[in-house]
């Protein structure tokens, strides 16, 4: 009978853990150990290696320095780098690259009312403008007819025109001015302050003949 009861009673599965009375920690619930942190390499100190963190910090510092410049400062930096490239290549620096720096230094050093002229600094013969820097024939006379024709002669040093066109129009504009200026002192100084007009002379001559 006892054997039949034991056979009829359900047997516990063999895979279930069984508590042993000899175990001193029996029945004690313990927390599982946390898994090691995953290194993301974001420089946040969460499991990343020190070398990766240093690289990220260095790149972040470089990006911060790059963004610390304003737009105008960035443009000026690129301008100076371009000038340095001309120096490194041994080529002459174009005038339109030097002119902004010259204006900036001169205005900050001498003030707006004491701006030194280019002739005083020995640069009077240079044409500091973008049009002259882009001139295809800088040594050619600039006299044109307003269309396609242009004088083919060389310019006079320090001028924009050749010997033929450098004095063009000066004599004609000065002749009537010089003639009137020379006639005025002669009329004022000959009669002791009395000026005789041609009309008065003719009237006096006609009156004398009538008498």
From Swiss-Prot:
Every WRC domain range: 135-179
Keyword Phosphoprotein included in the entry's annotation: no
Chief subcellular location: nucleus
Compartment(s) of residence: Nucleus
One cellular-component annotation, GO: nucleus
GO molecular function list: ATP binding
Disordered, as annotated region: 1-32, 167-190
Presence of the UniProt keyword Nucleus in the record: yes
UniProt cross-references to PROSITE patterns, sorted A to Z: QLQ, WRC
Keywords from the UniProt entry: Activator, Nucleus, Transcription, Transcription regulation
InterPro entries found in the cross-reference section: Gln-Leu-Gln_QLQ (IPR014978), GRF (IPR031137), WRC_dom (IPR014977)
Residue ranges occupied by any QLQ domain in the UniProt entry: 68-103
Chain positions of motif Bipartite nuclear localization signal: 140-150, 168-175
Pfam hit, one: QLQ
One annotated GO biological process: developmental process
Family: Belongs to the GRF family.
Role played: Transcription activator that plays a regulatory role in gibberellin-induced stem elongation.
UniProt free text on domains: The QLQ domain and WRC domain may be involved in protein-protein interaction and DNA-binding, respectively.
UniProt-recorded name of the protein: Growth-regulating factor 10
Gene name of the record: GRF10
